[in-house]
């Protein structure tokens, strides 16, 4: 499958042949894409929510008042779950929210996400992702030529330092090395920009 190679100024500078088994899958499996996104988001959850049980609440163990004669319901501890400031029954505990997903499914999810963007005309191949200076204004002017609202940019093994610094203050723009390519960011951004080096790495990784 042949497609254009563009410059950062959105000018055609050449042509590249993409692997159709990675960038042009015939039937897009949205269910697989969703599974991978759910797996990613679950794994990203911190899981550090925690409440104290009766045994963990700090306080006295003394009986608050005598058993009979006060007119109140009998109480044995100020730390009981029904008391203000007492322990919490069946509250959240620190745990991992991660779920298991086979590597083959994760790989398929990335292939189908790339194919979906390619089919929509939102996956662009860029000849070079390098800037002479880390100027945000320069990069904003270049990205404006693509007329997109958000950009997920994937470079080769290493991201250009100036380019990375220039993206820091740009809303909804993210750049990662090829190892950081993931389904969630591909789907949530309007445009996906790939360097030629990234294409080679992804085709090798997903074949």
UniProtKB/Swiss-Prot annotation:
GO terms for molecular function: rRNA binding; structural constituent of ribosome. Keywords: Ribonucleoprotein, Ribosomal protein, RNA-binding, rRNA-binding. One of its GO terms (cellular component) is ribosome. GO terms for biological process: translation. Pfam families: Ribosomal_L4 (PF00573). Residues 50-76 are annotated as: Disordered. Part of the 50S ribosomal subunit. Belongs to the universal ribosomal protein uL4 family. One of the primary rRNA binding proteins, this protein initially binds near the 5'-end of the 23S rRNA. It is important during the early stages of 50S assembly. It makes multiple contacts with different domains of the 23S rRNA in the assembled 50S subunit and ribosome. This is Large ribosomal subunit protein uL4. The lineage of its organism: Bacteria, Pseudomonadati, Pseudomonadota, Alphaproteobacteria, Rickettsiales. The gene is rplD.
């Amino acid at each position: 499958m042949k497609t254009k190679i563009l410059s950062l100024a959105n000018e055609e500078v050449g042509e590249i042949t993409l692997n159709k088994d990675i960038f042009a899958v015939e039937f897009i499996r949205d269910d697989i894409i969703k599974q991978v996104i759910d797996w990613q988001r679950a794994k990203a959850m911190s899981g550090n929510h925690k409440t104290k049980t009766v045994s963990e609440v700090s306080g006295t163990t003394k009986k608050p008042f005598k058993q009979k004669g006060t007119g109140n319901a009998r109480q044995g501890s100020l730390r009981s779950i029904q008391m203000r400031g007492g322990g919490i029954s069946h509250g959240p505990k620190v745990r991992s929210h991660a779920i298991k997903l086979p590597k083959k499914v994760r790989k398929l999810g990335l292939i189908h996400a790339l194919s979906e963007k390619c089919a929509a005309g939102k996956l662009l191949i860029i000849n070079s992702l390098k800037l002479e200076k880390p100027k945000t204004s320069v990069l904003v002017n270049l990205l404006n030529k693509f007329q997109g609202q958000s950009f997920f940019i994937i470079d080769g093994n290493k991201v250009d330092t100036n380019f990375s610094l220039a993206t820091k203050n740009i809303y909804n723009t993210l750049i990662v090395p090829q190892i950081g390519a993931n389904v969630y960011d591909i789907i949530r951004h309007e445009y996906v920009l790939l360097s030629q080096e990234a294409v080679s790495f992804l085709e090798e990784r997903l074949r």
